[in-house]
């Protein structure tokens, strides 16, 4: 849609897996313009499916760098043709799909600083990359490098404590190590390595943009406490890596003014500022305006938790990043694979394929489900690594089936209890001011949200997050303009639309023994699955040795409740890889 009247604004960009998108947000924080370019549809010459190339091994997944550059050319021309007034843009920021890496060939800095406004970007940058197809977050081909990094750092937990995550194949450090080992010539010809986010910022800046703290946390290279590159991690991945990455910066940093290329070709003002780009997940946290103690729950095909943390406790599951809007705090991500498809299966099996009947089942059963609880993993779960359906009655005995209405509540309570267990395992604590922001398909079901409110003991709000990464990037641009670290982000976005209250905790919800009951039964589920196997013994050992602070906090919670005291085997399930 076009907007012709002068309207001072900031732009928020999102270089995602399947498209490049932009929104314009005015000074009152209203979104008044948006545009996008879809890679498969609008750039078919690159032959991508879902924006990527999946290689023959089924593990290597890449995207053409020039496709992203050409997409930016197209979207800017579309904005120009629509009459968008670039002269009103005060600042811009953006987001990129996390973990992907771009390799700038020696001499590319000169090409960036001398762009001609008479030619599109892709024609001038086509020879600037030492690797034309770059690894993206879907790539899982660097297992060898992951094990090498963990071994060099003294184990997975040691690496997690330092960088916020154990080694993952998609994380950038392991991808860089693979490229160095398998294509040393291309690595030696590389003068700068960017994340997708800092690569996109570099296009606007006309020079190499630094990596920000938050997106840099997804590389297995950044010491998240000190906000500096870990020399040990760098050395374990590739030589001369620090100089190829450049120093990281706070996520709210103004990294410079926009390149004269955009001033001359499109009419941007010379004073338009570029605020450091970050990852799409951190940008979404900004778009949802999470504050200390808040939690966002995305209820989709996979369920994802976004947590605001003050004192993180890195673990072998989940990820901890530097917070994109407050460099003194942190954010965490937890992903659960068995999300909406699992809910739909139980709906079909136990509620006559009807969401209305599903809701009636939740309404007709009591909070706590009479002590009946289930964990449902029809596909191998990520957090924790476990598969199968595991039902327990009030005596903590495993049972084969529940009545339909009990099954429905067992599923929903079990899903949310597992989320709380793992969130608290990373250092999250429910506070008196905690808000839960729910998004995704299941956020439209009030009865599901009521269970969420009861399990966490906090009010649940719903918010439109269709463009959360883009909108969050525009908010971050305003934040950078206002002074960044010297100004609270909440002050900058106070005019943004408020989320809508959807559910409040039922009376007595905060006194229930949610965490203790569910933890005991989740352990029992894993024990039942792995009993008698070496893996089972490893899991049991992990439970005993790795529960730590979370176990103590759980016991304190139980002592404060009026429920029966916990069973002796109250421990925390960790993933089977903990003892690898």
UniProtKB/Swiss-Prot annotation:
Instruction: Provide any one GO MF term from the record.
Output: ATP binding
- Is Nucleotide-binding found in the keyword set? yes
Q: Any keyword ATP-binding?
A: yes
What InterPro entries does the record point to? ATPase_NBD, Carb_kinase_FGGY, D-XK_euk, FGGY_C, FGGY_N
Q: EC number(s) of the enzyme?
A: 2.7.1.17
Q: Which family does it belong to?
A: Belongs to the FGGY kinase family.
Per its record, how is this protein called by name? Xylulose kinase
Q: Which gene encodes it?
A: XYLB
């Amino acid at each position: 849609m076009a907007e012709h009247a002068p309207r001072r604004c900031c732009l928020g960009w999102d270089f995602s897996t399947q498209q490049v998108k932009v929104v314009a947000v005015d000074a009152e924080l209203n979104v008044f313009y948006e545009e996008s370019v879809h890679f498969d549809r609008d750039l078919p010459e690159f032959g991508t499916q879902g924006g990527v190339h999946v290689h023959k091994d089924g593990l290597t997944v890449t995207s053409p760098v020039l496709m992203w550059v050409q997409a930016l050319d197209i979207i800017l021309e579309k904005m120009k043709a629509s009459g968008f007034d670039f002269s009103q843009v005060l600042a811009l920021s953006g987001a990129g799909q996390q973990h992907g890496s771009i390799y700038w060939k020696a001499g590319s800095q000169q090409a960036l600083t001398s762009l001609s406004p008479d030619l599109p970007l892709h024609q001038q940058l086509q020879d600037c990359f030492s690797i034309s197809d770059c690894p993206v977050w879907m790539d899982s081909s660097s297992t060898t490098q992951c094990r090498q990094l963990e071994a060099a750092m003294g184990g997975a937990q040691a690496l997690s404590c330092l960088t916020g995550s154990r080694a993952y194949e998609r994380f950038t450090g392991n991808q860089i190590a693979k490229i160095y080992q398998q294509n040393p010539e291309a690595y030696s010809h590389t003068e700068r390595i960017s994340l997708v986010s800092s690569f996109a910022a570099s296009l606007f800046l006309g020079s190499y943009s630094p990596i920000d703290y938050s997106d840099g946390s997804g590389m297995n290279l950044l010491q998240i406490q000190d906000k500096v590159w870990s020399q040990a991690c760098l050395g374990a991945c590739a030589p001369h890596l620090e100089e190829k990455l450049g120093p990281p910066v706070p996520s709210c940093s103004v990294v410079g003014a926009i390149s004269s290329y955009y001033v001359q070709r499109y009419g941007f003002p010379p004073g338009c500022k570029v605020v450091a780009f970050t990852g799409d997940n951190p940008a979404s946290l900004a778009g949802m305006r999470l504050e200390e103690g808040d939690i966002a729950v995305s209820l989709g095909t996979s369920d994802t938790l976004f947590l605001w943390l003050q004192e993180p406790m890195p673990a072998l599951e989940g990820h901890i990043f530097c917070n994109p809007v407050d460099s003194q705090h942190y954010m965490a991500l937890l992903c659960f694979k068995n999300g909406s498809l699992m809910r739909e299966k139980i709906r079909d099996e136990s509620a006559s394929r009807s969401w209305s009947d599903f809701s009636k089942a939740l309404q007709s059963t009591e909070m706590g489900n009479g002590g009946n609880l289930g964990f449902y993993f029809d596909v191998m779960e990520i957090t924790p690594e476990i598969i199968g359906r595991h039902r327990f009655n009030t005596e903590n005995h495993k049972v084969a089936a529940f009545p339909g209405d009990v099954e429905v509540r067992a599923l929903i309570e079990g899903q949310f209890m597992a989320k709380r267990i793992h969130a608290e395992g990373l250092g999250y604590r429910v506070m008196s001011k905690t808000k839960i922001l729910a998004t995704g398909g299941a956020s439209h079901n009030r009865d599901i949200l009521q269970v969420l409110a009861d399990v966490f003991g906090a009010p649940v709000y719903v918010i439109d997050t269709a463009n959360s990464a883009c909108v969050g990037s525009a908010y971050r641009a305003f934040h950078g303009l206002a002074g960044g670290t010297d100004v609270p982000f909440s002050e900058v976005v106070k005019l943004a639309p408020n989320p809508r209250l959807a559910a409040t905790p039922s009376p007595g919800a905060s006194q229930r023994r949610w965490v203790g009951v569910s933890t005991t039964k989740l352990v029992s589920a894993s024990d039942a699955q792995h009993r008698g196997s070496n893996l089972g013994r490893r899991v049991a050992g992990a439970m005993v040795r790795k529960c730590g602070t979370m176990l103590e906090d759980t016991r304190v919670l139980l002592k404060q409740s009026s429920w029966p005291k916990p069973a002796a085997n109250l421990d925390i399930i960790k993933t089977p890889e903990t003892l690898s």
